[in-house]
Amino acid sequence: MATENDNEKRVSPQRVLLHVCCGPCASACVPRLKDAGREVTMLFANSNIDTAEEFEHRRAEAERLAVHDGVAFSSLPYDHADWLEKVAKGFEDAPEKGARCARCFRYNLGKAAEWAAAHGFDSFTTSLTVSPHKPSEMVFAAGREVAENGGTAFLPEDFKKREGFKLSVARVKELGLYRQSYCGCEFSKIPKASCRRA
């Protein structure tokens, strides 16, 4: 016979941690996750960003989105020196969508997986798949790999599907969000940058 506590467990929404690369990309993810009945918390964990000023600008915009969309928000400390040592060293000349990016995905999603496990989330996912410039399968591979070590399930949501990027562009205009002109690290500042202004 089901108890009252059993019923509460059955109807409580799944708690999902959304690793947020930036406000514009997250703007397409939060509505989809909420529409699926999930309780969303946004986590800004992006030490790949090349300067503290740019990091803070993007963090503040992501938090502004969280307030607007009514979801919890947290961020991890900025440590670009650690990212350079553990991710970029030896891969400075790797092309975009190459080995350096794969290492970066593992680094940032690894931080998210650890945080999700420490705070009792059912799963974690990422806004990285909104961008048409980010290969979703590479992101998924990184998420699954770190999930094996982190103790929290990875939710492989391809947010660019069902016109996710188009939705993000529309919401950026609606909310006046800052859309950066490059992905984040100094090595992504190339003529064909991986992120464009709306």
What is each of the regions a protein language model found here?
Residues 1-198:
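Nucleotide-activated chemistry modules centered on ATP-dependent adenylation/adenylyltransferase
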